[in-house]
């Protein structure tokens, strides 16, 4: 009786490493290979079709696209907007957040089909190996994790030669730059990125400046969620994000260089272009300045910073993340209205807001103008009381110079 083949789910992106993994496990190890592409919004329909065709050519017995774009928005992107999350005040955590949901989808699929193993193409140098492995260890604890790229330490050329030898050819030419294109931005690695003193040339970006002059962009939020772009309403938040990306990318908005610490402790540098995240977060933060109290903004910033860090550090499944999400969700109850931005090549600025929850418009008075909610004597009394701790301190430390 023929021995039953073991099932392996390969997290398949269509790139060199995962292509090699599919073929090697099918041919050399005798696995029944299930190629699964977890899409968080970064793949086009054409790319997914090519992935399917190639997976079967490489030896997979089955190919599936696991579309988790809506889940990615509902369980991650939404909260990153609520928290105005930018890692180190710069990077919208594009790749980090996507990887977690890709791993979740792969783990669920592996459990569903009763897989014996899960394979992915991460190297031993980056963050992704941690994000994938940790998720699989938690959600598919009895499934073996296979990482040929990490364990066999093969060069790109060795992988290409192996594929060619077995009749599979594709354009795996190593370009100067490598890109990770996603719904929440595109990361750029390689080339000048490897030199701390250099920036990226225009040619390195996938989206180029197409517009001159300036225009206004109106982004409307309801309870913190983007609902309209230039007064065009969207029921699907993904389509709203894509619309903002289309408008902002034409001006080359959202380009920057992120320098941060990897999970394993080394510093890394990555270029990125992320028009939609930077515009949406910029508009949302601006609207919050009008609609939230001082302490709501302060404490939300603290927990949002932790949320972004935990997301990056592969701690999405940590229970405290659900607690932080609950706080962020509740903080948005009055974040309603339209933020107006001015777009121009490579930059944008804030203009104003229209909101029924605007706390700047108040019967108590306007900053720097005539007060209406208190008298001059009230103001003087408030100032005197507020100064009490300082007056007490310096009365007891008259020798201190200031």
Language-model segment annotations:
Residues 2-11, 16-402:
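Nucleotide-activated chemistry modules centered on ATP-dependent adenylation/adenylyltransferase
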């Amino acid at each position: 009786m023929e021995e039953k083949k073991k099932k392996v789910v390969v997290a398949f992106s269509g790139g060199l490493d995962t292509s090699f993994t599919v073929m090697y496990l099918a041919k050399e190890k005798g696995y029944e290979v299930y190629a699964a592409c977890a899409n968080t919004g970064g793949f086009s329909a054409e790319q997914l079709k090519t992935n399917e065709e190639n997976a079967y050519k490489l030896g997979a017995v089955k190919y599936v696209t696991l579309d988790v774009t809506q889940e990615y928005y509902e369980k991650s992107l939404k909260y990153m907007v609520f928290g105005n999350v930018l890692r180190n005040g710069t990077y919208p955590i594009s790749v980090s957040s996507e990887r977690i949901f890709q791993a979740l989808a792969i783990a669920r699929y592996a459990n569903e089909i009763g897989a014996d193993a899960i394979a992915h193409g991460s190297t031993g140098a980056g963050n992704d190996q941690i994000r994938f492995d940790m998720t699989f260890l938690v959600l598919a604890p009895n499934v073996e994790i296979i990482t040929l790229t990490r364990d066999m330490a093969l060069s790109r050329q060795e992988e290409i030669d192996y594929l060619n030898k077995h009749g599979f050819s594709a354009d795996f030419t190593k370009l100067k730059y490598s890109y990770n294109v996603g719904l929440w931005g595109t990361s750029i690695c390689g080339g000048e990125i490897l030199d701390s003193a250099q920036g990226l040339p225009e040619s390195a970006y996938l989206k180029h400046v197409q517009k001159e002059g300036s225009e206004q962009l109106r982004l409307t939020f309801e309870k913190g969620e983007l609902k309209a772009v230039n007064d065009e309403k969207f029921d699907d938040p993904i389509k709203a994000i894509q619309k903002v990306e289309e408008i902002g990318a034409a001006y080359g908005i959202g380009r920057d260089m992120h320098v941060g610490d990897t999970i394993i402790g080394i510093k890394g540098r990555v270029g990125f272009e992320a028009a939609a995240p930077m515009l949406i977060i910029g508009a949302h933060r601006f609207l919050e300045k009008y609609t939230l109290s001082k302490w709501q903004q302060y404490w939300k910033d603290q927990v949002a910073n932790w949320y972004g860090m935990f997301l990056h550090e592969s701690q999405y499944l940590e229970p405290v993340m659900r607690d932080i999400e609950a706080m962020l969700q509740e903080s948005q109850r009055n974040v309603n209205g339209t933020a107006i931005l001015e777009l121009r090549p490579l930059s944008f600025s804030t203009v104003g807001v229209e909101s029924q929850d605007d706390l700047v418009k108040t019967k108590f008075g306007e900053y720097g103008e005539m007060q209406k909610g208190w008298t001059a004597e009230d103001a003087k009394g408030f100032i005197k009381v507020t100064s009490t701790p300082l007056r007490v301190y310096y009365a007891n430390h008259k020798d201190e110079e200031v």
